[in-house]
């Protein structure tokens, strides 16, 4: 770095980050009246410049670059004193009205205007205009030559100046005093104001770097269409800029190829608002390149992407497009750490290294994976493309650092140091934004930070939270290969361990968080982003989303599928057997349909936890029956270690049955609670055909020799009932479980029955009262149905020639009305929360509240009334927890539907109403429709 030697001289110096005051001058004591620019008197430099220009107007041009006339700062005069212009040889020339343009009269004499200078032939264009001896010239010489090349494209109402690092009072500061500059005369006052300012060149406490200091420290350009978008601490010359009507501002770092760090800062200010400074940045880069300088530290090597990376970017773009359309988001960006090796190629101001000058990881947007839903935000996208972020900057950098979704209700509140794009966000009126770090199963440990900007009109905290929840839900449905990153992966990377990342490794995903961040004097607390494991929870996509998500590369779908399936082995699947299929699919980064296909490939026909959940629901029913028997004081418990029901349930020492006519009045028992911590392999059918021991209930604690022992064996069906046998002579018979689970009362066979051909059972009246006294409506109906069937069988034995359905004297006909009455009253007595029913028939949908305790038939009546259909002339299907349509044909099915809703924490049931084929039969001259039976 060219660092002038400080010396004592009253002149251009000042305080860091403020206006300059009387102190030691950083330059030598030589008397210089061209803004103390001594090199201008060097014969070699003068010869180079005259040979460069080779024109009578050269004397005029020479007066345009060094500071003009006797410096007010050096001479002790005020800013309002007229400036005298000097040529390169120290001769005074008349000051034109605008320094940047040649007087028209003079242009006629010379035959050239400022726009024609150097445009006659190729020898006066581009880098050929600069002598080859610039390599040995000082930095100031080369900047002077670069300004001469840049002046043609500058236009009017602009000031270009260079900030150089100097030492002052033990600090390294940036100063433009005595440095080359270009200006329009109308901005001469602002030039003199700038000469009085110095800015810190290092991050030191208590020192404000200002715009030049920020660019010097970060090594990347910074620009704005209007300085009004800066806060006053971010642009320390704000009051002076407004006084001189400054609007546009551009600051670029200058690198010497022989040095690794920034050696100067180029600043350009204009009186016009400019949408961007792309053209000016390109012109500055070309001018610097001609004098062996550059405005970027890295190279312009084009990056190439693998096929898997292209797949990932394609899916990300599809996801962003769908979400922006579904939720009316104006913009969504994809940030990529450069360490991925997939940055977006060379852009001015982007250094090619993976780390910034401060040593932090940097992230850049990948433009092909960004989506602009509002055309007005295209300018913000271009601003992001010109500026990288460091890890921890902005919400995208914070999401990368914290590994959790990060939300800010107003990104404009950030300071420019915390969020280098804050002034652009203020320009485009962007408010809330959320960022989440994801990875793809196709690209291993490559990180992608998706940043979503909420609509400008979405400002309330409640409205923002609702939108975040909806956004999370949408991502769960449409993401395929994308998944969140679990902490173990980040810990391994931070610890420097060289562990190979497995694409489909199990992940411990966070469930939401509240993130707080302080920036400057502001403290922004991020609201919880509900269900942050959104990236791996795909499901059935809604029709409107399916239309929006149009994969750009359908031809690669098969390859994507095989890649995901190929990496999921049986050992990996076993680790997820204890949870639901959806949770496993989320953790593995595949959709449930794909996971089902993988299971079938490994010989697994049904997801194990589905069976376990059904067993648990059946155990509730069994427990109700067991508890209804007098003297049973233990509850069923499922032991996941053995796959059996291990707790022992004992009967009283003396359990006697008075006769075949009845049983003791039972007590209403409690249902066993569902075990949520079931292990993975228990109760599962494995591919090797080995069948693990299913649930068994062992009832022991034999006290006396005549005690009865109950065993509930295993069954292969999904529902289990109880069927225990006992004999009075202590001989115990073990019976299988009732495969349908419909009859849960205990049937005891004994030798003391009056009728040896019949089973020992209680009277119908006491048993019916016992059934009605229970809590579960579905169990009531099932048990009563079975009871009526057995009663009908008994009546058939007693009256073999009489039909129980037609002969009222047989007692069967009288029992049927009793069944209906008791069932309805029992169902009404059972208190249960109301369900929200959404029934669809021929494209029409109705919605209403329904109490499950009212029963299945009442549900039919409600639906028939709303669709004006004959009751029972249609079939119902409900959507279960595996997104499958299951027939709802009786109260047992209704209870199963309620259990499924409870397991997933929902109170909304979706029904499909379908017409049933009518069976036409005739009896005599009449014709009637025989509808499908709806009883249990």
Swiss-Prot record:
Cellular component terms (Gene Ontology): nucleus
Gene3D superfamilies: Phosphatidylinositol 3-kinase Catalytic Subunit, Chain A, domain 1
Residue ranges, compositional bias (Low complexity): 754-769, 801-815
Compositional bias of kind Polar residues: 688-697, 770-781, 816-825
Stretches assigned to the RWP-RK domain: 550-635
GO molecular function: DNA binding; DNA-binding transcription factor activity
Keywords recorded for this protein, A-Z: DNA-binding, Nucleus, Transcription, Transcription regulation
Main location: nucleus
Top-level taxon of origin: Eukaryota
Intrachain S-S bonds: none
Location of the protein in the cell: Nucleus
InterPro entries assigned: NLP, NLP1-9_GAF, PB1-like, PB1_dom, RWP-RK_dom
UniProt feature, compositional bias: Basic and acidic residues: 671-682
Chain positions covered by the region annotation Disordered: 99-130, 666-697, 753-782, 794-827
Cited SMART domains: PB1
Keyword Nucleus in annotation: yes
Residues in PB1 domain copies: 834-916
PROSITE patterns: PB1, RWP_RK
UniProt function note: Probable transcription factor.
The protein's name in its UniProt record: Protein NLP2
Record organism: Oryza sativa subsp. japonica (Rice)
Name of the gene this protein is made from: NLP2
């Amino acid at each position: 770095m060219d660092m002038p030697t400080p010396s004592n001289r009253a002149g251009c110096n000042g305080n860091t980050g403020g206006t300059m005051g009387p102190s030691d001058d950083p330059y030598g004591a030589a008397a210089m009246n061209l803004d103390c620019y001594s090199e201008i008197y060097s014969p070699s430099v003068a010869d180079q410049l005259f040979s460069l220009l080779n024109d009578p107007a050269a004397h005029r041009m020479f007066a345009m670059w060094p500071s003009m006339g006797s410096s007010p700062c050096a001479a002790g005069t005020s800013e309002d004193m007229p400036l005298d212009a000097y040529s390169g040889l120290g001769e005074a020339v008349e000051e034109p009205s605008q320094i940047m343009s040649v007087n028209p009269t003079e242009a006629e004499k010379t035959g050239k205007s400022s726009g024609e200078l150097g445009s006659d032939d190729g020898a006066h264009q581009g880098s050929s205009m600069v002598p080859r001896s610039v390599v040995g010239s000082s930095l100031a010489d080369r900047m002077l030559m670069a300004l001469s090349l840049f002046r043609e494209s500058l236009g009017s109402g602009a000031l270009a100046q260079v900030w150089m690092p100097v030492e002052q009072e033990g600090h390294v500061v940036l100063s433009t005093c005595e440095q080359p500059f270009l200006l329009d005369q109308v901005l001469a006052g602002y030039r003199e104001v700038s000469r009085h300012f110095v800015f810190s060149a290092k991050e030191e406490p208590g020192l404000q770097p200002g715009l030049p200091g920020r660019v010097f420290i970060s090594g990347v350009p910074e620009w704005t269409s209007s300085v009004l978008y800066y806060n006053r601490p971010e642009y320390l010359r704000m009051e002076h800029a407004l006084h001189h009507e400054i609007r546009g501002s551009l600051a670029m770092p200058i690198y010497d190829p022989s040095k690794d760090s920034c050696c100067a800062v180029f600043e350009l200010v204009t009186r016009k608002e400019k949408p961007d400074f792309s053209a000016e940045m390109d012109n500055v880069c070309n001018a610097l390149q001609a004098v062996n300088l550059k405005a970027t530290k890295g190279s312009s090597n084009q990056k190439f992407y693998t096929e898997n990376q292209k797949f990932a970017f394609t899916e990300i773009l599809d996801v962003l497009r769908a979400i922006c359309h579904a939720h009316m988001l104006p913009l969504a960006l994809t940030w990529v750490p450069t360490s991925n090796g997939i940055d977006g190629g060379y852009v001015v101001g982007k250094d090619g290294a993976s780390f910034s000058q401060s040593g932090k990881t940097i992230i850049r947007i990948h433009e092909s994976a960004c989506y602009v839903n509002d055309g007005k935000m295209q300018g913000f996208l271009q601003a992001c493309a010109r500026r990288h972020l460091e890890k921890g900057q902005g919400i995208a950098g914070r999401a990368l650092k914290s590994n959790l979704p990060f939300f800010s209700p107003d990104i404009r509140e950030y300071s420019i140091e915390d969020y280098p794009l804050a002034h652009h966000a203020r320009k485009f009126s962007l408010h809330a934004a959320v960022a989440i770090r994801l990875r793809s199963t196709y690209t291993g440990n490559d990180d992608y930070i998706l940043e979503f900007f909420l609509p400008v009109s979405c400002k309330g905290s409640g409205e923002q939270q609702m939108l975040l929840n909806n956004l999370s839900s949408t991502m769960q449905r449409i993401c395929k290969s994308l998944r969140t990153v679990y902490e173990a992966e980040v810990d391994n990377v931070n610890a420097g361990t060289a562990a190979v990342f497995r694409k489909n490794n199990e992940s411990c995903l966070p469930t939401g968080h509240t993130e707080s961040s302080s920036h400057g004097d502001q403290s922004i607390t991020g609201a919880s982003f509900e269900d942050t494991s959104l990236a791996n929870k795909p499901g059935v996509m809604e029709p409107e989303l399916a239309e929006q998500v149009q994969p750009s590369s359908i031809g690669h779908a098969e390859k994507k599928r095989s890649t995901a399936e190929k990496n999921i082995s049986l050992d990996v699947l076993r680790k997820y057997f204890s949870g639901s299929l959806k949770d496993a699919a989320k953790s593995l980064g595949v959709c449930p349909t794909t996971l089902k296909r993988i299971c079938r490939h490994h010989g697994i026909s049904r997801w194990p936890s589905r069976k376990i959940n059904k067993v648990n629901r059946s155990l509730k029913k069994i427990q109700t029956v067991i508890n209804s028997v007098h003297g049973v004081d233990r509850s069923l418990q499922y032991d996941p270690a053995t796959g059996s029901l291990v707790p022992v349930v004992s009967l009283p020492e003396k359990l006697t049955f008075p006769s075949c006519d009845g049983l003791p009045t039972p007590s209403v028992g409690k249902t066993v609670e569902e075990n949520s911590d079931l292990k993975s392999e228990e109760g599962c059918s494995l591919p090797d055909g080995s069948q693990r021991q299913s649930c068994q209930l062992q009832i022991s604690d034999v006290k006396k020799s005549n005690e009865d022992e109950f065993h509930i064996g295993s069954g292969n069906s999904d529902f289990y009932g109880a069927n225990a046998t006992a004999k009075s002579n202590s001989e115990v018979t073990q019976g299988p479980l009732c495969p349908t689970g419909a009859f849960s009362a205990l049937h005891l066979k004994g030798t003391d029955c009056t009728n040896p051909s019949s089973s020992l059972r209680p009277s119908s009246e006491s048993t019916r009262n016992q059934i009605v006294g229970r809590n579960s409506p579905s169990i009531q109906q099932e048990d009563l149905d079975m009871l009526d069937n057995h009663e009908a069988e008994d009546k058939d034995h007693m009256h073999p020639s009489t039909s129980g359905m037609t002969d009222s004297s047989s007692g069967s006909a009288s029992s049927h009305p009793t069944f209906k009455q008791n069932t309805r009253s029992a169902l009404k007595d059972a208190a249960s929360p109301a369900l929200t029913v959404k029934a669809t028939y021929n494209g029409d949908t109705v919605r209403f509240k329904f109490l499950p305790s009212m029963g299945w038939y009442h549900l039919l009546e409600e639906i028939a009334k709303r669709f004006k259909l004959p009751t029972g002339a249609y079939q119902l299907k409900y959507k279960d927890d595996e997104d499958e349509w299951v027939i709802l044909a009786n109260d047992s099915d209704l209870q199963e539907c309620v259990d499924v809703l409870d397991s997933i924490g929902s109170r909304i049931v979706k029904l499909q109403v379908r017409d049933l084929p009518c069976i036409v039969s005739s009896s005599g001259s009449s014709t009637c429709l025989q509808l499908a039976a709806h009883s249990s």
